[in-house]
Each structure stands twice: as C-alpha cells, then as structure tokens.
C-alpha cells in the first residue's frame, strides 16, 4: 500500500499528518511574495516540514486509509505499521526514501531522519 499518497491527500486539508512510529508531516502557508525590482510575483504556497518526535497515532491517517480502501481501521493501522517498518529498514540501509508529492527522507550521520520537501507540489 502506498500510504504516501494518502499522506499527500491529507496534507492538502490538514496542517499535521502523523505517521505512527515514524513522525509527523507539518504544513505552513507561506504568503505570496512580490519583488518589485525584478517584476516578480510568486503565489502563496504550503511548505512541508517533518517532526520525528511526533509519532503517536492520532487516527487521522488510519481513518482516511480505512475509508478510502473500504477496509477496517485495524487493517489500516497494520498496513501503516508494515509500511513504516519497510521505510525504516530502507533508511537504515542508507537509502533515500522518496515520498511522491511530499519529499525525501534520509538518515544523517547521527541516524536522525532528515526531510527534504519537494517544491514543485503546492
């Protein structure tokens, strides 16, 4: 199951999407920017950050998956746990973990998760 697709969907509607056992993706709206000297305008956009300290299941992601997949909440929780297990394994093997329409996760030298958001998706 590609839970990153569900995370991306939820990030359009909510400021915080917690992935139990991994961390939380947080959004912040960045105002439009005007640079008069360059005649440049950039529209408002959402910026995505990641907090590895927020790991408890708040139910948002699991409920969303259960509704979308027409399955039980318990099955959705177990699917998330399985995916998180695989993600952590990939990170520990020094892999970059791309999450479609969200960004990339990797471990730094101190084994902390580092998140790099994709800028092309608003």
Labelled PLM ranges:
Residues 1-122:
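Cytosolic/nucleoplasmic/matrix-facing N-terminal domains/tails
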């Amino acid at each position: 199951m590609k839970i990153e697709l569900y995370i991306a969907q939820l990030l359009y509607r909510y400021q915080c999407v917690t992935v139990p056992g991994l961390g939380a993706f947080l959004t912040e709206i960045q105002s439009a920017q005007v640079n008069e000297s360059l005649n440049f305008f950039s529209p408002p956009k959402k910026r995505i950050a990641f907090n590895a300290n927020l790991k408890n299941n708040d139910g948002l992601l699991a409920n969303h998956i259960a509704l979308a997949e027409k399955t039980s909440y318990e099955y959705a929780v177990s699917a998330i746990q399985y995916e998180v297990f695989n993600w952590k394994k990939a990170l520990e093997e020094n892999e970059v973990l791309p999450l479609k329409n969200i960004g990339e996760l990797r471990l730094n030298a101190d084994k902390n998760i580092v998140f790099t958001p994709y800028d092309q998706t608003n």
